[in-house]
Amino acid sequence: MHDGGVIPNRSSLFLGAALLAGQVALAPAAAAAPLLPFQQLVDAAAQRLATADPVAATKWINGGPITDPARANQVLDSVAADATAHGIDPQYVREVFTDQIAANEGVQYTRFGQWKFDPGTAPTSAPDLAESRTQINGLNKTLVDEIALHWNSLHSQGCSQDLSDATAAVVAARGLDPLYQQALASATQSYCQPI
């Protein structure tokens, strides 16, 4: 029974639901939260770190070493050239990417340790390393673009606070676990270099 003993029929329920849906659909969308100054930069660093798991899985399955100095040098040379093209200090960019590579390797070493202690959790399949490298190359470009965009801010007195705020936002948005939080802190440790 409904108010006053009247039972609504299906068509009136459908009409009511449709009207309610229309009201919800017509309601103005909440404005998206504005991005923090370094949020896209830090998010790109987090995305690049996320490649550590599939890369580690590939290396685990194929028996490859975690460190790959030739690949690291190729990445560092490429981002330094990109930095030069942007008119920013290539040595700064090399330093930032050295941290990023080391953090990625740290995650990979952690995964290898976990899989060694608990072989049942070790991967049995992994993507082709070329797929991960294509993703990494794209993120490298994004990172250099973001560094160039925020060059002055990365060298300002307010950098540390902006970096801390952006990191907290990315950690929350991506739900990063303690390992990835530590890796992100390590990957971004050289971002702020006030002049």
PLM segments and residue spans:
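A structural signal for well-ordered alpha-helices, especially hydrophobic packing surfaces
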Residues: A52, A83, N104, Q108, ...
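Secondary-structure edge/capping motif, primarily at the C-terminal ends of alpha-helices
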Residues: K59-G63, R111, D118, H150, ...
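Glycine-rich, aromatic-bearing surface loops/beta-hairpins
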Residues: W151-I195
